[in-house]
Amino acid sequence: MTGLRWATQFCPSAKYILKCDLDTFINLPLLTRFLPIIKGKVRQFMIGHGHEKQLPPVLREGKWAVSDHLYPFDYFPPYLIGHSYAMTSDIVKHLLSVSDFIPLIPAEDAFITGVLARIIRVPRLHFDGFAHDNHVCLPCNIVYNEDITMTKMSLSRLLLLWRQISMDDCLAEELPLIRNQFSNDSVAIGDIFWYSRK
């Protein structure tokens, strides 16, 4: 929530807000072409990789544990995986105002893109090009604009990947090379689907 407050204070003219983990690479050239295309179809939205389960279970033990006094339900609303997701900036003030009345849940992605997003009724859109744990993303997928984000990367790999994007070239050993599916600034809306409208 602090990051969203910071963004509204220091980036008031931003059209989009991106949340990403420190070990996540963002293909900014592709993302900056991609988001306006979506906004042309959907005025307000969150987009990322939807949780694999339509009713994501609330974990009561482990790293992502949420106590039942904070969140007494067995399932979260559908939410976007927290490695990386983007949203139109005009929904942030609504998220912040609602968050003042809801106990903060330590699972940030479930809280912001699940609980709060459901309350303000913002569409959450799933796109496979955003990182998630079960997706094998090769560096060439980023370089040749198949994927927008890649996660669990070391600093040296992040720098190497940026150099490869800048040169529009990929290391030969990093197989499947499919050229730039977004180069004409269009995206098949069929590749993106409503994760949850509720």
What is the role of each PLM region?
Residues M1-K198:
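Secretory-pathway lumenal glyco-enzymes, predominantly type II signal-anchor Golgi glycosyltransferases
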